[in-house]
Amino acid sequence: MKPKDKKILKPHRPARLKNTRLLDLEVLDELPDNIKFKAKRTPEKVAETYKKDMQLISGRILEIKSNYQYTIEANNKTFTATLSGRLKQFAFHSKSIVAVGDYVELDIVAEPPRIENILPRKNTLTRYLGSNFQRPTILAANIDQVIVTSSWRKPMIKPGLIDRYLCLAALDNIDAIIIINKVDLCEDREKLEETVSYYKNVGYTLLYTSALTGEGIDELYELLKNRDSVFSGQSGTGKSSIINRLEPSLNLPTAEVSDYNEKGKHTTTSTILIPWSFGGHLLDTPGIKTVHLAKDTKSQIPRIFPGFATLAPLCYFNDCTHTHEEHCAVLSALEEGKIPTNRYLSYVSLLNSL
């Protein structure tokens, strides 16, 4: 039987183009020199593209509501606005697309008014979740200073929480002021000053205040005038009471601290930007029990922890962690009693948490 012939494979030839003709190159010479050919736009160009019928004005976000609704101050008026469709695409992937304190461009022709552009931020105050998959939450944007509010009692003072707030502000290059409220409940002023004098010694502004008696309110008033300040701190420390003392017309809600566990209750449920009558703005934030920093900031903590900024450059190793290295200026200061032991232990605890 004759073996079956193998099929001979022929090289594939592309199909011929039909009904096509090449562009006459001489036609290109006849086109005007200023003709513009449409090309793919970069994201930057897309972000700067506005409709012709827009009327844009600059404003600032006072409050973030639900469902893409925002309260905005612009031209001495208050608007309730929404995000443009373009910005909503970014907001779907990031909660930090807009923050209280942001400067924006608002289209007042649209109904309702629409945020078309978010202007560059000077700074942000950002905190992170404590899980391994951290997601940033911007508490406020474009601020001048953070007022770290603590209390001597009800709830008890937590210097470790103050340390974390100060590091949070330092990471974002924001000035920090510490106020110890409810000093009217303190029966031993020497013990109070011994507990917190370290912060004053290393350069922080420290105030003792009482919303009940008015102690320290005048000094705080001068520090807040014509500046944008964010009040942050543990729940129940009296932030709202201090604000009401400074600006009685606000009449912010307050709550009593539990006598059983000396823990405060949340009276501020969202961040809001409020203009002071004496110039500047107030950013009141909800109280939180603890502050988590970004895990990728661990290498910066040895240089920004309260009191370490002037000592870290004196260490022999540039990447000194101040835990075991030889010729460490921080460890030497600890041995000499210049750094309190409890502050150093707070530093180690913060470092190990990252």
Predicted features, each with a name:
Residues 1-28, 35-37, 55, 68, ...:
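Helix-rich effector regions associated with P-loop NTPase G domains
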Residues 70-74, 81, 106, 115:
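SH3/SH3-like beta-barrel fold
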Residues 78-96:
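Beta-strand/loop nucleic-acid-binding surfaces
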Residues 99-100, 114, 134, 141-143, ...:
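Switch/coupling subdomain of P-loop NTPase systems
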Residues 185-237:
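Canonical P-loop GTPase G-domain recognition
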Residues 143-150, 172-183, 203-209:
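Conserved beta-strand/loop subsegment of P-loop NTPase cores
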Residues 239-255:
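A conserved segment at the C-terminal end of the G1
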Residues 109-111, 116-126, 143-161, 184-188:
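Conserved Switch II/interswitch segment of TRAFAC-class P-loop GTPases
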